[in-house]
Amino acid sequence: MGEWILMLNQLQMTTDGQIRDKVEIAVQRLRSFEPPDGYYVAFSGGKDSQCVYHLCKMANVKFDAHYAVTSVDPPELVRFIKANYPDVKFERQHYTDGKPITMWSLIAEHTLPPTRKVRYCCASLKEPGGRAVSW
């Protein structure tokens, strides 16, 4: 995690100031639009999620970061998130009977694995997370 802060600080020291300006604009926007309950940050562990996470930290806004467990998550990714972002909440979706929704249960329901053209897994495993925001 420290590497990201170092990289952001190095980017802010660019002579042309373009990246510094973009970071500052992002920080100001996060502050300007901060919801009363804070932000719900969907966190995948990827570079974009890490960037948003660190921008939220820099802006000093209230936020919770959430990782949607799919049951086919790479162990290296899970270890990385737990080691570097210990405050990220791991969330799993459940059926109405309380059983966890897994990739394997979805394949059985749909009678085929997800494909490039048939993508049902995100709708069941990732998109239900979050909370409604009213403007």
Task: Give the role of each language-model region.
Residues G2-W135:
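ATP-dependent adenylation/nucleotidyltransferase module used to activate substrates
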